[in-house]
Structure formats: C-alpha cells, structure tokens
Amino acid sequence: MPEFLGPIAGFGVTLSTMFKKPETEFYPEEKRPTAPGYHGRHQLNRYADGLEKCIGCELCAWACPADAIYVEGADNTEEERFSPGERYGQVYQINYLRCIGCGLCVEACPTRALTMTNEYEMVDDNRAGLIYEKDRLLAPLKTDMTAPPHALRPGTTQDDYYRGDITAVPEQAAPEQAAPEQPAPEREPNPETEK
C-alpha cells in the first residue's frame, strides 16, 4: 500500500463504525443477565429442613488467596443444633474489599455450603458495610424450612444429610383426632321387656 494511503486506512475503522447504531447500556434501569457460572456474591446454603450446611471447618478461609474469609467454628449441642455435624460456623465473615472473586473457597468447601450467586451489586458508602457477616450470607429460609437451632429430622443421621437424602421436609401428618364421645342414645321403652 502506498504511504500516502496510510492515514486513510487508519481512518477506515473510524469511518466504518461512525454510522453504526451504538450499543448503549441503560445500566441502572435495565440490567443485563449475567453469564452462567458468574462469580458474584457468596451464599451460605441450607439443607431442606433449614439446618446450615456449613460445618465450620475453615477450609474456605485457608483456600482464599486474598485472606478475605474469616470463620470461627463452634460445637453443636443437643439443645442447640445449627448443622447436622458436630460443628457449625458460629462466625462467618467475607470481606468484599479484599475478595477477588476467584471461587477457590467454593471449590474447597466439602459440604457445598458455600456457593457464588449472580448478584454483583455490592456497593456501599461505608467500608464496614462491605464486610458481610453470616446473617447477610445465609440463604433465606423457604416456607417449609425451620430456623435453626433445631434437632435433626426424626429417623435420620448426619450421614443422611451429607449424602443428600434430605431433599424435602415431609408433610407433617395431622394427629389423628379421636372422635368426640357421643352420648349414648336414649332408648325407647320396649313394652315387652318392661313387663
């Protein structure tokens, strides 16, 4: 190509895109769907009966390269059971000022308690507001779930929870109501027996 055509070739890209319709995003009003597998805000999941999946093992905190996760485990008791195992995550914090969204914490979780949602709007005017505590990370309770602490489902073990056998809360059978006692019907006098 001759040297004097160089500037014209350079402006060729500009001229070809100058008359195209721009792809404008009206972001706050119209939100585009995220791609499948998008790494957004974390979520602590629950079992179908409402118990937490987190067992407080701290593997997610060890796997985090940015040191953004802090977990304190505590022991479950028979009076207060938050997860089906021996332990649960009493304190769970994720610092989104440090989180890089890599997902290594999700891969390290042995009970699939930690997942990443598609939620990406995590802005705050306060730095402390970007340190998410356990109450902001827990999945919301569904209508058929019971808020912990509560006992394991009757007739189940910890292994049933870990194997995924606890899928839905069984409908509570209504206790059989005894029929109200009916007063004995009054007998009509029998003329043959009353002789």
Swiss-Prot record:
<keyword id="KW-0004">4Fe-4S</keyword>
<feature type="region of interest" description="Disordered">
    <location>
        <begin position="145"/>
        <end position="195"/>
    </location>
</feature>
<dbReference type="GO" id="GO:0050136">
    <property type="term" value="F:NADH:ubiquinone reductase (non-electrogenic) activity"/>
</dbReference>
<dbReference type="GO" id="GO:0005506">
    <property type="term" value="F:iron ion binding"/>
</dbReference>
<feature type="binding site">
    <location>
        <position position="54"/>
    </location>
    <ligand>
        <name>[4Fe-4S] cluster 1</name>
    </ligand>
</feature>
<comment type="function">
    <text>NDH-1 shuttles electrons from NADH, via FMN and iron-sulfur (Fe-S) centers, to quinones in the respiratory chain. The immediate electron acceptor for the enzyme in this species is believed to be ubiquinone. Couples the redox reaction to proton translocation (for every two electrons transferred, four hydrogen ions are translocated across the cytoplasmic membrane), and thus conserves the redox energy in a proton gradient.</text>
</comment>
<keyword id="KW-0830">Ubiquinone</keyword>
<keyword id="KW-1003">Cell membrane</keyword>
<feature type="binding site">
    <location>
        <position position="99"/>
    </location>
    <ligand>
        <name>[4Fe-4S] cluster 2</name>
    </ligand>
</feature>
<keyword id="KW-0520">NAD</keyword>
<keyword id="KW-1278">Translocase</keyword>
<dbReference type="GO" id="GO:0009060">
    <property type="term" value="P:aerobic respiration"/>
</dbReference>
<dbReference type="InterPro" id="IPR010226">
    <property type="entry name" value="NADH_quinone_OxRdtase_chainI"/>
</dbReference>
<feature type="compositionally biased region" description="Basic and acidic residues">
    <location>
        <begin position="184"/>
        <end position="195"/>
    </location>
</feature>
<dbReference type="GO" id="GO:0051539">
    <property type="term" value="F:4 iron, 4 sulfur cluster binding"/>
</dbReference>
<dbReference type="GO" id="GO:0005886">
    <property type="term" value="C:plasma membrane"/>
</dbReference>
<feature type="compositionally biased region" description="Low complexity">
    <location>
        <begin position="168"/>
        <end position="181"/>
    </location>
</feature>
<comment type="similarity">
    <text>Belongs to the complex I 23 kDa subunit family.</text>
</comment>
<feature type="binding site">
    <location>
        <position position="64"/>
    </location>
    <ligand>
        <name>[4Fe-4S] cluster 2</name>
    </ligand>
</feature>
<feature type="domain" description="4Fe-4S ferredoxin-type 1">
    <location>
        <begin position="44"/>
        <end position="74"/>
    </location>
</feature>
<feature type="binding site">
    <location>
        <position position="109"/>
    </location>
    <ligand>
        <name>[4Fe-4S] cluster 1</name>
    </ligand>
</feature>
<feature type="domain" description="4Fe-4S ferredoxin-type 2">
    <location>
        <begin position="90"/>
        <end position="119"/>
    </location>
</feature>
<feature type="binding site">
    <location>
        <position position="60"/>
    </location>
    <ligand>
        <name>[4Fe-4S] cluster 1</name>
    </ligand>
</feature>
<keyword id="KW-0677">Repeat</keyword>
<keyword id="KW-0874">Quinone</keyword>
<keyword id="KW-0408">Iron</keyword>
<dbReference type="InterPro" id="IPR017900">
    <property type="entry name" value="4Fe4S_Fe_S_CS"/>
</dbReference>
<feature type="binding site">
    <location>
        <position position="57"/>
    </location>
    <ligand>
        <name>[4Fe-4S] cluster 1</name>
    </ligand>
</feature>
<dbReference type="Pfam" id="PF12838">
    <property type="entry name" value="Fer4_7"/>
</dbReference>
<keyword id="KW-0479">Metal-binding</keyword>
<comment type="subunit">
    <text>NDH-1 is composed of 14 different subunits. Subunits NuoA, H, J, K, L, M, N constitute the membrane sector of the complex.</text>
</comment>
<feature type="binding site">
    <location>
        <position position="102"/>
    </location>
    <ligand>
        <name>[4Fe-4S] cluster 2</name>
    </ligand>
</feature>
<feature type="binding site">
    <location>
        <position position="105"/>
    </location>
    <ligand>
        <name>[4Fe-4S] cluster 2</name>
    </ligand>
</feature>
<dbReference type="InterPro" id="IPR017896">
    <property type="entry name" value="4Fe4S_Fe-S-bd"/>
</dbReference>
<protein>
    <recommendedName>
        <fullName>NADH-quinone oxidoreductase subunit I</fullName>
        <ecNumber>7.1.1.-</ecNumber>
    </recommendedName>
</protein>
<keyword id="KW-0411">Iron-sulfur</keyword>
<keyword id="KW-0472">Membrane</keyword>
<dbReference type="GO" id="GO:0048038">
    <property type="term" value="F:quinone binding"/>
</dbReference>
